[in-house]
Amino acid sequence: MAQTGQLQIAHDQDGSRERLALSGELDVVTAPALDAAVERLLAGRVESLILDLRSVSFIDSSGLRSVLTAWDSCREAGCELLLIPGDGACLRLFGITGVLDDLPLWEPKSGDGFAQLDLA
C-alpha cells in the first residue's frame, strides 16, 4: 500500500480485475500518486481496472483531473475502467461538475471480490 500525504492507495486483484482502493484526500498534493499508480498498472497490460473511491473523504479539481485522466488512459490502453464512487465527496463532485452520467460507474455486489473495502 502506498501512502502519500493524506492519501492511501491499496492495490489488489480478483481474477482479471485489478483494483486501486483509495482512502483519504485526493487533491493537488496527492493526485500525482494516483496518476503514477494507474500508469504503472497500465504498463502491465491490465484488462480491467477498478478505481475504488468509497473511502475518499475529499476530492478537488486536481483529483477529478486524475480520475478523468485515468479513464482516458484506460481507453487508450484498451483497458476497461470501472469507478466505485461511493456516496460521499466523489459522487458529489462528479454530479456538480456534470460528469456523473458519463463516467463508467460500477456498484459491486456482495458476491464480488471487491464488495468490501479493506485498507487495514
Label each PLM-derived region with a short phrase.
Residues 1-57, 68-120:
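STAS-like cytosolic regulatory interaction modules
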Residues 60:
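Conserved G/P- and acidic residue-centered "switch" motifs that form tight phosphate/ATP-binding loops
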